[in-house]
Amino acid sequence: MGQMEEYEELIAAARCEIEVDLLLLGGSVANLISGEVRRSDVAVHKGRIVGFECSSARQIIPLEDQILAPGFIDGHVHIESSMVTVPEYARAVVPQGTTTVIADPHEIANVWGEEGVRYILQSSRNVPLNVFVMLPSCVPATDMETAGAALGPDALVGLFEEEGVIGLAEVMNCPGVIFRDPQIMKKIQLAGGRLKDGHAPGLSGPDLSAYICAGIRSDHECTTLAEAEEKLFSGMFIMLREGSAARNLSDLLPLVTLKNSGQFLFVSDDRHPADILREGHIDFMLRKAINEGLDPIVALQISSLNAARYFGLADLGAIAPGYRADIAVLDGLDAPRVTHVFKDGRLVARDGDFLAPMNRPVKAMHKSIHLAALSRRSFEIVAEKGPARTIGIVPGQIITRSLPLFPLIREGKVVSDTDQDILKLAVVERHRATGNVGLGLVQGLGLVRGALATSVAHDSHNIVVVGTGDEEMLAAVSAVTEMDGGLVAVADGEVLASLPLPVAGLLSESHMQEVAEGIAECIDAAHKLGCDLEDPFMTLSFLSLPVIPELKLTDRGLVDAVAFRMVPLFLGGSLEDD
């Protein structure tokens, strides 16, 4: 059917001249454009809403006493944080009312580059979830680590032409923008009139203005009311984030008023399987916002319409004639729960059950772990004078402290000290078999025996391992390698628990429930080894992220993430940082 014929059929359906495909009967429409809730039937034809008055339909679904709202839109998400493939991600979030996500495939791009982005795009086809992609702007994140790939301007040229790509994802290199680094400016230029998302924690004053003048219109990194207020006053869209590691919704919600609410979007950023399954997705943020006093209609606008308008998705975000029939049916507005989900006019979920047929998934490229030969000696640290820069974990946060501590030394070598909780930490390069092994120390994990390792290690996703002995660390890295990526806890050379993540070392092809159970088993094993952190693997995965203060470890060594430079492990006899 050509476009003109489709328009003519939709017009006929809207005039009730022909039988429509679907009639949703007896509910009330949350009209986010007019800002009201009104009792009304909804007629759907060819995947589009065609009106409110037709009575003849091939299928009628009664929805008495329920609220029909537009399907929810997540304005910024790294799907890879869910540790499942796109089809399995859809299986989990669609029953929670999410029908559209704006994805930044930054994680898989750090492993597979262009092919990683294309894998996400291809995996997103023929699933009952709109997946629009913003191209990663900073791969690799820094030159102080070894990533699996690089996405330079030349790589972005072709990717911008791919169906489903709508802009440039979070521009993390704020100094590069402000001081006009040629590489980042070229990427911004290539984006042209497409949207450019921001990532500007703490940026303020003239630097913020300069950053915005590059065409960057949003930010999801606000953590304080004052920061969000300045960025709002400067014209930015504020993404209200409620992830797993970063939860900022409650802190920022007081800024939302009836006059400015159109500038806010809900985003999950990084949300892990257990949180999605236990709490929810955008529906969780909707309930939380309403519970904290936000008007339900405003909360629904932030859940869908605002994102649709910001991203230029003109036929999403409302229940009105001509819009796509992506609908989340709610049991009320006080603490809304999703009862039915329609995608393009098809019932795809009911009462939490996923109903849509799923096509055979795109075949993933496996074998992403490529290590040089390792031995116990790969983890040896030769002692030097003075205290050592030690990564100090801050429970519940991804920032760390840089602590000058004296490690335990035996026969001229640094060994893990379980009494002081100063453990050896290593980041093993796994993309190019370079043989790089960054060595450091960490305090706060609490292991008294064994080792933990993971191939999920932001942002370059090398293998990060912590342990009470070199043999244990080697055993943990070997176990991750044998699984072609994943999480593992070992003790006495034996694997206690593991979760294989064979897709890029980041994702499982199993259901999210199975992945969540696997993570829980790994965490439980870590707790039995002495670690008392709520999620030690999440903590471990951020110890290699050199763009977050204060001290981090990459495969190339220790990084002072405040001064943004490589530093030696030992301070050379002084307690003052050099």
Located regions from the model:
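Divalent metal-coordination and catalytic microenvironments
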Residues: 27, 47, 65, 76, ...
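Active-site beta-loop-alpha junctions enriched in small/polar residues
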Residues: 78-82, 106-108, 136-141, 171-174, ...
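Histidine/acidic residue-rich metal-binding segments in metalloenzymes
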Residues: 150-169, 175-240, 246-266, 277-291, ...
